[in-house]
């Protein structure tokens, strides 16, 4: 099931990023269409403000205020595609962790720790798109979990040596 979902996420990411590239490529037509729809009242200004929420919020706002709607939408799609790829990678490493849990006599193994570190780093990177504050809190929690698992691996190694 997780493999199917990973493939689905990757396909979605590719389609979203491809759509962003197409929108950027058709920039003149898209900008003209959205501009006339705004002028005609068919689209409200608040309907397109979501695209102003790019990684650098000032950039998205400047693009929309300057009438470059296609570039704002395209960048938004590219960032969304990258976020979906990050989710697929997190799912991949988390599924490897649980697979190793099932096959191992102890969760405190170096391979599990390595996959856990990678998954937690990807989660911190993913949360950074929501804001720096939540990313810092997530990073501190991830650091605590990693330290607990490192200590558990050390205790497991000592236990294995005494047997």
Describe the function of each predicted region.
Residues 1-40:
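Cytosolic juxtamembrane helix and N-cap/initiation of the first transmembrane helix
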Residues 20, 25-28, 68-99, 140-143:
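Transmembrane alpha-helical segments in integral membrane proteins
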Residues 23-37, 100-104, 151-161:
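Perimembrane helix-loop junctions in membrane proteins
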Residues 96-120, 161-162:
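Membrane-helix boundary/juxtamembrane motif in polytopic membrane proteins
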């Amino acid at each position: 099931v997780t493999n199917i979902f990973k493939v689905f996420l990757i396909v979605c990411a590719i389609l979203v990023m491809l759509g962003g590239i197409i929108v950027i490529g058709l920039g003149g037509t898209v900008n003209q269409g959205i501009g006339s729809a705004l002028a005609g009242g068919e689209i409200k200004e608040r309907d397109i403000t979501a695209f102003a929420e790019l990684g650098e919020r000032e950039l998205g706002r400047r693009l929309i205020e300057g009438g470059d709607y296609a570039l704002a939408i395209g960048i938004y799609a590219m960032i969304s595609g990258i976020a979906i790829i990050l989710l697929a990678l997190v799912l991949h490493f988390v599924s490897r962790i649980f697979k190793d849990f099932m096959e191992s006599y102890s969760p405190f193994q170096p391979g599990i720790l390595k996959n856990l570190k990678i998954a937690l780093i990807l989660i911190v990177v993913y949360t950074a798109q929501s804001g720096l504050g939540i990313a810092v809190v997530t990073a501190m929690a991830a650091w605590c979990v990693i330290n607990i698992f490192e200590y558990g691996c050390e205790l497991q190694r000592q236990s294995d040596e005494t047997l």
